[in-house]
Each structure stands twice: as C-alpha cells, then as structure tokens.
C-alpha cells in the first residue's frame, strides 16, 4: 500500500506523515516513511541547492532553467522509486511519502512549465493508492512559514504559494487517487480525518 501526503508549504505534511506511520505500526504493519527530496546523496544535494542564501543555492529561477530544475527533481524521484518505493511495496510494506511527483506538477506548473510535459517526465513513477492533499489557505501558510528558522526559496513568495495551491486543487480533479483534507483543523483532527480516509478508501476494499 502506497500513500502520499501533499500540500503547500506549512500544511503539516511531515507531521501527518509521521502520525500516520505510527498509526499503521501500532496496528502491526511494516511501514516505510520517506520523503522528497530524498535522503539519498542526490536528494541531499537537491535539498542543499534549494536552500535560500546557501553558497551553493542555484535554484532561484534565474541561475538554472525551470526545465533543469524539473529534471533534477525527476532524477531524484527515479532513484526513490526504483531503489526504495518499488522494492518496499514488493515485500508488502506500507509506504508513506511526504511529497511525491504531485509536488513537482504543482510547483513547476506554477513556474510556467507545461503540465503535460511534467506528467510525461514523471510517467515512470508508480502511482499511489491514496494521496492526501492537505489544503491550507495561503495566508495561513505564510504565517506558519515565517515562523521557521530555515526557509527554502519556494517559501519566499506568497504569489507562488497561491498558484501552487490552485494547481493542487486542479490536480485533485484530474487524479482520482487524490483526496482533500482541511489543514486548518487541529493536528489531531487532521490525523483523524486521514485515518478515516485510509480506512474507507484502502482497508475496507
């Protein structure tokens, strides 16, 4: 079973992915909790490149092309899929990922790239059984992001977040595996909503 948690910055993806993994573990499932960019050498390189103000920070929309950025993330994802996700699913594990190719579609589409090209670029990526989209108003997103000590360059502009949120909602209409959860609720309520979805959509099949 493969579940992905998506949403704009500040939506609480990492927290909810962790809570869901803990819920599955308590039920006796073997769980793999992962994220994108990954913790591989390639993923760490990308993560470092995305950090604002870093000496090696190149992804600012000026120093490399948006196409190159999309290809970098897709390359990390290819490693992720072939070395972790597919092998884990093959052995019957539950895989939960904090972000996946939907993030690339939402963000890079917001940067002006063609959606169909982005979908084709990520066609190798195995489709999840369920994608939880944590939907958060941009105003609340910016409030939460501003409280962080480290900001990625994706966090800089509210206008980008607005486009990304709109794109996520459009993607939810296109991809049948996506379900929307209100991320303005409390952490506990959001977790309960996700568990209810998992039980309804996956465990009772």
Swiss-Prot record:
Q: Does the keyword Kinase apply?
A: yes
Q: Which GO terms describe its cellular component?
A: cytoplasm
CDD domains documented for this protein: TMPK
Write down what this protein is called: Probable thymidylate kinase
Catalytic activity reported: dTMP + ATP = dTDP + ADP
Task: Fetch the HAMAP family from UniProt.
Answer: Thymidylate_kinase
Sorted keywords for this record are:
ATP-binding, Kinase, Nucleotide biosynthesis, Nucleotide-binding, Transferase
User: Which GO biological process categories is it annotated with?
Assistant: dTDP biosynthetic process; dTTP biosynthetic process; dUDP biosynthetic process
Q: A Pfam family for this UniProt protein?
A: Thymidylate_kin
